[in-house]
Amino acid sequence: MATSFTKNGDEYLWLRDKNFESTDRPRCGIPILFPNCGKPDDGVHHFGGTAYPIEVHGFADLVPWQVKSADDSAIELTLTPNGLTKFVYPFDFALTMRYTLTGSTATLALTVANTGDKALPFSVGFHPYFAASKLENVAFDINAATCSENAKGEQPAAPETITLTRKEGSADSIRLMTGVKSPMRLSDSGSGHKVAVAFDESVFTNAVLWQQDAESFVCMEPWNGWANSVNEEGRHIELNPGESKEFKWSVTIE
């Protein structure tokens, strides 16, 4: 998981120290979401008639990865099944995560390979926490087909200007978007930060804006599924045995 991205000594990612030092699900940096984005209905996936409990956003950041290679501008890590993953996700797979830094752009590429003998169902997303002076100072430049606070049911058309505001009585602020065009941008009038998130629109079809508890961050997240997608036919990715697929996106400090 990426934990820092700086330019001229200025930090653009947000790190929650207590959370990062604990064994809890990471809620800072740039978590990897696999094999699900969000929390499925009743907190379970159904495979072959059996219900498997799964964490919010899956397990990719709850288990150790192995460093495959590293140099001054890139690092590559791998993850294969273990006892924990088999308990919640009864499939064979290989994940390869490559981080590459070029100037003011960090490129993140996740390759998912099906190493088993049956179809591999999953969704993928990323959850970057960008440092923010406060939510009211952050403006977004995002072109999307739909935008709502709930992924279920008919989705309303997105407004010309998408905003993220705190709902009275709620600790969370969220926008769920489909048909999102690349890139998405945010600018913070308080800190002067400007960030662009670019991605392959055929791979990352959805996106999420999220903020919680008036903390000093805002999330602008590329996803290709929703919370219950892995349980819904036609709403998740399936790789046949021997197949692989790359999910690449980038963050640029502007």
Where do the language-model regions lie?
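Acidic/His-leaning functional-site neighborhoods
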Residues: 52, 57-69, 166-235, 241
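Beta-strand-rich N-terminal accessory domains
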Residues: 1-31, 35-37, 42-44, 51-54, ...
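Asparagine-centered strand-capping/turn motif at beta-strand->loop junctions
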Residues: 110-116, 211
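Hydrophobic beta-strand positions in extracellular immunoglobulin-like domains
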Residues: 101, 112-114, 251
